[in-house]
């Protein structure tokens, strides 16, 4: 990302004849919030004095009696919006206390910034790079409801295998076949891949917004699962990239009559959508993860970083897999990484070491468990803090496992730890194991307590008290 100053932003706004500035910040669960001001009101005072807003209406922020908050712009995030009818400049802001002007401790972007500063303070490294690969589904329609006397959801995509018997295509013409089999969507060309033109539009919008792309393709799942990969970035910017990526993917689909979801598991019986996170540490422009004598070319630093990720995974997943739906994905049989080990070839391991040859700059690890249902600022920061704890305390991971973990004999499989099976478990683990997150004041106890309460009250308990439709298939005639 090119460094920008306030003057650069003003010049961009003038050159592009910007009419409006969209003020953006992130709530605690991970949804970007915004309001719009006219370009004429966007001047130096915004950078000096900020913009006030009511924080009591933002999830996870202030209570009503202390609602006033302040926003200060981050000039490096200025981008022209590709979707607005009027020429609009989008800018991400940091949240501050309006009286002390201190960064707000529950602002996710501020937490990511603190994580980067803490990394530097340790002397271990000065830059953490993250490359996140977020999968998603493209549907034609979605409907759902949850009432006292009924509950349902239904998604549809004309390319879904369940539509082999449909009379017509989406345009009303006769069914012409070429539906994608469950778990059969990885790489077939058109007409099996019916989304190539839409993905091309997504690619174009991403490129025009500054992304350096690697590839886009249909993913394994039927019904339009897809993935588009782009270049890594430093932690805070990588989280900004993920939020912008999701905004562009969703709105490109919306403008073309489709709807996108990043839910980890929207379909029963097919692959879920993950957010594999490639990570590496650098210092003074030099990579720290490579040692030609180590397993898979890993340095001691890299191995201990992995040790920290795996050791803290049961609590770390509270930020990297933070929804009830996350644990519908982390089950055997769907290429999901549920085994808390590392490997240079096994994709069912939580940590995989990509084959990068002898290039030290390319050496990295891939944490495969995360999904994109949460807050990338918190997720990336939490992963870094777990890895740094591993380095500081020289946490050794369990020996690498290069066998097919699903084919191990029972006695050997029993020695392989696995990810927790439900959100309530990882929230309990976070309550017991979070000191690694509060090192250097990166995460505060208040933030962690707020996260735990929010998840229990707004997600875990509401799901637990509602009858599930499948329970009627099991128990109605008891």
Curated annotation (Swiss-Prot):
L-glutamate binds at residues 271-272, 329, 335, 347, 368. It is an enzyme of class 6 (ligase). Its cofactor is Mg(2+). SMART domains: Gln-synt_C. Optimum pH is 7.5 in the presence of magnesium and cobalt ions. Optimum pH is 7 in the presence of manganese ions. Residues 108-478 form the GS catalytic domain. One of its GO terms (molecular function) is glutamine synthetase activity. ATP binds at residues 214, 230-232, 278-280, 347, 352, 361. It catalyses: L-glutamate + NH4(+) + ATP = L-glutamine + ADP + phosphate + H(+). It holds the Pfam family Gln-synt_C. Mg(2+) 2 binds at residues 135, 219, 227. Induction: Repressed by phosphorothioate modified antisense oligodeoxyribonucleotides (PS-ODNs), which acts against the mRNA of glutamine synthetase. Binds 2 Mg(2+) ions per subunit. It comes from the Bacteria. Disruption phenotype: Cells lacking this gene do not show a detectable glutamine synthetase activity and is auxotrophic for L-glutamine. This mutant is also attenuated for intracellular growth in human THP-1 macrophages and avirulent in the highly susceptible guinea pig model of pulmonary tuberculosis. The modification O-AMP-tyrosine is found at residue 406. Mg(2+) 1 binds at residues 133, 276, 366. Belongs to the glutamine synthetase family. Involved in nitrogen metabolism via ammonium assimilation. Catalyzes the ATP-dependent biosynthesis of glutamine from glutamate and ammonia. Also able to use GTP. D-glutamate is a poor substrate, and DL-glutamate shows about 50% of the standard specific activity. Also plays a key role in controlling the ammonia levels within infected host cells and so contributes to the pathogens capacity to inhibit phagosome acidification and phagosome-lysosome fusion. Involved in cell wall biosynthesis via the production of the major component poly-L-glutamine (PLG). This is Glutamine synthetase. It comes from Mycobacterium tuberculosis (strain ATCC 25618 / H37Rv).
């Amino acid at each position: 990302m090119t460094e920008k100053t306030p003057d650069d932003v003003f010049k961009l706004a003038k050159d592009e004849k910007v009419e409006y500035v969209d003020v953006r910040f992130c709530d605690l669960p991970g949804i970007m919030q915004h309001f719009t001001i006219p370009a004429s009101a966007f001047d130096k005072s915004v950078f000096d004095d900020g913009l006030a807003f009511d924080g009591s209406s933002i999830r996870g922020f202030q209570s009503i009696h202390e609602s006033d908050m302040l926003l200060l712009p981050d000039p490096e995030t200025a981008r022209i919006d590709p979707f607005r009818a009027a020429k609009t400049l989008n800018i991400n802001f940091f949240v501050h206390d309006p009286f002390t002007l201190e960064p707000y401790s529950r602002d996710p972007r501020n937490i990511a910034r603190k994580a980067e500063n803490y990394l530097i303070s340790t002397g271990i490294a000065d830059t953490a790079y993250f490359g996140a690969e977020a999968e998603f589904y493209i549907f034609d329609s979605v409907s759902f409801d949850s009432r006292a006397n009924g509950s349902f959801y239904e998604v549809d995509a004309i390319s879904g295998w369940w539509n082999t018997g449909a009379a017509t295509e989406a345009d009303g013409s006769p069914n012409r076949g070429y539906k994608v089999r469950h778990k059969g969507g990885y790489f077939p060309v058109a007409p099996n891949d019916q989304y190539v033109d839409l993905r091309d539009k997504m690619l174009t919008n991403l490129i025009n917004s500054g992304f350096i792309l690697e590839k886009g393709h249909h993913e394994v799942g039927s019904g339009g699962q897809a993935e588009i990969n782009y270049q890594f970035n430093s932690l805070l910017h990588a989280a900004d990239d993920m939020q912008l990526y999701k905004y562009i993917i969703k709105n490109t689909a919306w403008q073309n009559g489709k709807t996108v979801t990043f839910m980890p598991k929207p379909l029963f019986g097919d692959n879920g959508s993950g957010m594999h996170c490639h990570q590496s540490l650098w210092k003074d422009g030099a990579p720290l993860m490579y040692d030609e004598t180590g397993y898979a070319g890993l340095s001691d630093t890299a191995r201990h970083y992995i040790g920290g990720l795996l050791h803290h995974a049961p609590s770390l997943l509270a930020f990297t897999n933070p929804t009830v739906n996350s644990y519908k994905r982390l089950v055997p049989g769907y290429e999901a990484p549920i085994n808390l080990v590392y490997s240079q070839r096994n994709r069912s391991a939580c940590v995989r070491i990509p084959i990068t040859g002898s290039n030290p700059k390319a050496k990295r690890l891939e944490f495969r468990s995360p999904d994109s249902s949460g807050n990338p600022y918190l997720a990336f920061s939490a992963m870094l803090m777990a890895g740094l704890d591993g380095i500081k305390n020289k946490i050794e991971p369990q020996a690498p496992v290069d066998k097919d973990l699903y084919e191990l004999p029972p006695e050997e499989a029993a020695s392989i730890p696995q990810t927790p099976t439900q959100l309530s478990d990882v929230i309990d683990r976070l309550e017991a194991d979070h000191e690694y997150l509060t090192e250097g004041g990166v995460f505060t106890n208040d933030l962690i307590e707020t996260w735990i309460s929010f998840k229990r009250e707004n997600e875990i308990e509401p799901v637990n008290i509602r009858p599930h439709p499948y329970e009627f298939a099991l128990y109605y005639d008891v």
